[in-house]
């Protein structure tokens, strides 16, 4: 029986004309590259896979942790909007340290 490895992923969606904010998707997938293609289909701008973290069976717990931690930045569902500097200097390092 094949075991599926789950990942928590971080994606960035480009938004035309907006340069001081980043739109970030934090989610779970067993195939983040395939998930990226699905997300790209629904977005007008380019979407990039920034980082994946192998999370195993607890992937949804880890995802939920970050959704709660950043709920004030939520724009709906798994999407969050951060100032560029805040994301680069605080959010991404927190996620890397967490995993």
Specify the residue positions occupied by each region the protein language model found.
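Non-catalytic accessory segments flanking enzymatic or RNA/DNA-binding domains
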Residues: 1-99
